[in-house]
Design a protein with these regions (language model features):
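Type III/flagellar secretion export determinants
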Residues: 1-177
Length: 177
């Protein structure tokens, strides 16, 4: 393995993953966004785990999966906080059902979820849904009555997953030679 640092960019070039996962009203400025990178020390840890797993005939064991989950969480929006805000509003009597959400304007929904998130109600077709978007315009959550919440992975999360799995695969493959 070389000692280069691998970074990913959510705008299709492989250079930098930058996202802000703030769900509070004090959003970070674009220049202050969190940046994730596959550092040398992280890559060394992945190589160590891949070698250990290869020795035990396990592919992507629990330690690697936990590491991957922790790294992805660094770029993921705080979905639990967003869901909590919605649930709190629903149970407080402010909004009782999807009909009341439909009547709420987009501005109210955006105030509920906080900057930098935006929300949109869709009430046509076979059912109604509430869609929540991050500052990049990516849908991160959808709520439908009767089904509940559905998480959608962001490009940044996908980039981190891909970088970690690639580093692991290469190390595992080398260890099996």
């Amino acid at each position: 393995f070389s000692s280069e640092v691998i970074e990913m960019n959510i705008s299709n070039a492989i250079n930098t993953v930058s996202v802000s996962g703030s769900s509070s009203s004090s959003a970070k400025k674009t220049s202050e966004k969190n940046k994730w990178q596959l550092t040398d020390s992280l890559k060394e840890k992945i190589v160590e785990l891949a070698k250990k797993d290869a020795k035990n005939n396990i592919y992507m064991g629990n330690e690697f999966m936990n590491l991957r989950k922790a790294e992805v969480a660094k770029v993921a929006p705080n979905r639990a906080a967003l869901i909590g805000k919605f649930n709190q509003s629903m149970s407080s009597g402010n909004m009782g059902d999807m009909k009341e959400i439909q009547e709420a304007d987009k501005r109210w929904l955006c105030i509920l979820f906080g900057i930098p998130y935006e929300a949109e109600y869709q009430g046509e077709g076979t059912g109604s849904a509430l869609h929540i978007y991050n500052e990049e315009g990516e849908e991160v959550l959808t709520y439908t009555q009767g089904v509940g919440w559905h998480e959608k992975e962001t490009k940044a999360e996908t980039g981190v997953h891909s970088a970690l799995k690639l580093a692991y695969y290469e190390a595992y493959h080398d260890a099996r030679k």
